[in-house]
Design a protein with these regions (language model features):
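Alpha-helical solenoid repeat scaffolds of the TPR/TPR-like class and their adjacent stem/linker regions
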Residues: 1-203
Length: 203
């Protein structure tokens, strides 16, 4: 029904970029990625500065395994809005599952590390980020496929964790408090946070 409604809206006003973008979102949810690509491409053709459509197009290219195209979409947004946190985040966390060679792995690892530095720099120099902007960025992607490189990721994961901590402290300062060392003999409780608890094939 959503597809039908948006297609009718496109017929009524084919030059409204937002409708094409929304139709693309529906097609993406349905797993019809090529149709989603066509919708997003039409949206940015109508409005070249439509940052959400560029980001959405990049996300679909990622699903299709076209990682360089995805990164190009995020770079376009950064050209339009240099401080766009979501695009920097998406670009940083874009990894192939399988690499052509070891050199390509090195390039993506450097991109990831450079991405953490860039976002830290944005946090140092920009104070306008809202809670929604930070949450939208962090939930847009993760570094899940970093582990597929088969390297020692401790250093990179520490930098990523420090960045996550810094971002969450900005929006949830009440949860960032010094904790006293537990000297009792009780078991330490460890919490896990993961989107897979909600959306996963085995849940």
């Amino acid at each position: 029904k959503a597809v039908s409604c948006y297609e009718k809206a496109v017929q009524i006003n084919p030059n409204f970029a937002g409708t094409h973008n929304n139709l693309g979102l529906v097609f993406k949810e349905l797993g019809k990625f090529q149709k989603a690509v066509s919708c997003y491409e039409k949206a940015v053709q109508i409005n070249p500065n439509f940052v959400d459509a560029h980001n959405n197009l990049g996300a679909v290219y990622f699903e299709l395994g076209e990682h360089q195209r995805a990164i190009s979409c995020y770079k376009k947004v950064i050209q339009i809005e240099p401080n766009n946190l979501t695009s920097h985040w998406l670009s940083m966390n874009t990894f192939p599952i399988i690499y052509e060679n070891l050199k390509e792995i090195d390039l993506y690892r450097k991109r990831f590390e450079d991405g953490t530095k860039k976002i830290n720099h944005l946090l140092d120099t920009q104070s306008q980020y809202t809670k929604k902007q930070i949450v939208d960025a962090m939930k847009s992607s993760t570094n899940f496929y970093l582990s597929y490189q088969g390297r020692n990721d401790i250093n990179l994961q520490q930098k990523y964790a420090n960045l996550i901590e810094r971002l969450t402290e900005k929006i949830y300062p009440q949860f960032h408090q010094e904790r006293t060392i537990n000297k009792s003999k009780k078991f330490i409780k460890i919490g896990f946070v993961s989107s897979f608890f909600k959306n996963h094939t085995i849940s």
